[in-house]
Amino acid sequence: MKHPSYYLLATVLLFAGCSSDTPAGDDNTTFSPLPEANASLYETDQVFTDVTAMTVKNSYGAYVTSQCYTKTEESDGNVHNPCFTCHVNSVEPNYIDDAALQESYAFSEATYKNPWSNLFVDRTDAVAAVSDAAILAYVRGDNYFDANGSIMLGEILKHVPDAWDYNHDGQWGGFVPDCYFAFDGEGFDRDPGGDYTGWRAFAYYPFPGTFWPTNGSTDDVLIRLPEVMRQNKEGVFDKEVYKLNLAIVEALIKRSDIAIEPVDEKVYGVDLNQNGTLDNTSKVVYRWAAPSYDFETKRFYNYAMYYVGRAQNAQIDNALHMAPGLYPEQTEFLHTVRYLDVDANGSVGMAPRMKELRYGRKSAWNTYPQLSNAAQAEIKDKDAFPNRLRTITGNEETGLNTGLGWVYQGFIEDKEGYLRPQSYEETLFCIGCHSGIGAVVDSTFVFPRKFDGGAKQRGWYHWTQSDSGFQEIKEPVLADGRYEYTLYLEANHAGDEFRGNDEVTARFFDGNGSLIPSEIEALHSDISRLIVPSKARAMMLNKAYRVIVEEQGYIYGRDAHVAPAANVHQQVAVDTPTGIKAVTMERYPLQ
């Protein structure tokens, strides 16, 4: 069977609104594409959902994800372990180190009942009622830009609706979407006037499991460093300075050398290649030693590595910080989660329509000791009060705090497909993964997974800038030498946490449940064989998620599925063994 290719629409199509050549369907069921209206019409005509309430209707433990309730043991004794991707031995300064959670359902009296009831809803009839033509028209509709090219949310938030205004002061105090998804040849986003927005796209290995397109969504991620890191020492925007600072941050996050375009270190006054002299270099060398600390002035000095431009001065002044495994303060990430599009050839790719627009910002710097103390305090609190839930501060307008220096905020589709702010309870869904597991690097998943110097544009590009998508991208290899996706298949014996992806099972496993060697060998050279769905599966998952959107029941789960999930507990006794023997790994840097 020929495996489906993965394509990504050109930017002009991605953001041009609904396609005019949608194939005809065989029934009359339709979803109307989002009207192409200007922002003022959207503001006056749209019924704005009230999302300001802090009341939690379903679960204060919504930071415990649906995947955590998966059944790991089958009646025949077979054991499945998708848990190790998130709950794993961590690297300092992530002190969570929670590989032991693979081995038991370490819930509390407040979380042992699965609150994600949407998993058990049968949507067979609702999905069957939707034609392919209808869902394609819907996912090709643009719910980010209006017909004039303005960012709809940006226009609305200039005069924030009272239904979205948490403190009812008439001002939006949170993130205002400002990315135009108009990327130059180096992945930098430009606004309509040609100016840099600061956002830069990068390509990466999708995180195992849920975030593979075969399980329902495509996505992209962009990074933006604070303004001081985009400026030269005169305080003027300088793209070359910004590129170097991004490379330095990448080296610190990956703890490895990073290839760059040849530069003259004398221009920047920083020994990037750490050879003791200012000369020409084609790499940022990662070599770290803890800086000195003056207890009298309470300042760090004598760093082993330095930023360039104005950021170097800020670092020396201790207004900007640096450490391995940590981003500088005010680093931002933008993450869109999208539907799957299918072209006339059956190739599956990124749809224009966004399911979610997710935003994260590092609001405060925490030292290694502070992060360690926070982790230890969490452990002590859990031991002393096992049934006490975490207290997550924040609100839907300004975002929710992780407690580790990050703020997360999101926008999600309303019933008609427009993007709206997530409520407090809907945003709780994001917090557990970004602050309570061993897999993250300074609260993030993807930047450590960015493609390296051997990739196109050294990994600095948006998916829409690649004609081949995931085809012929080699499987990531862990720092310990094991193939990462193969390890997932070996440990989980499935292609997703719920073991509902029949396509992956049929392709990679034989009748006895053993991996097929020839398929694994092919996977090593082409990850699209695993992570890209067929046209039929893509359409099915699009329809299933659209039904959830119409219901607006995100607080009960947003996992796209048709039949009720069979391999998930509705409740499980506290500390029940999973039957798993914990998997540990040395994950980064990926090879």
Feature names for model-found ranges:
Residues 345-346:
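Extended interaction-bearing regions that mediate binding to partners or small molecules
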Residues 75, 79-84, 88-329, 334-341, ...:
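Extracytoplasmic redox metalloprotein regions
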Residues 21-158, 163-165, 174, 349-591:
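Sequence context surrounding c-type heme c attachment/ligation sites in exported
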Residues 2-10:
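Sec-dependent signal peptide recognition
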Residues 7-8, 19-22:
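Long, low-complexity intrinsically disordered regions enriched in Ser/Thr, Asp/Glu, Pro/Gly
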Residues 15-17:
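C-terminal motif of bacterial Sec signal peptides marking the signal peptidase cleavage site
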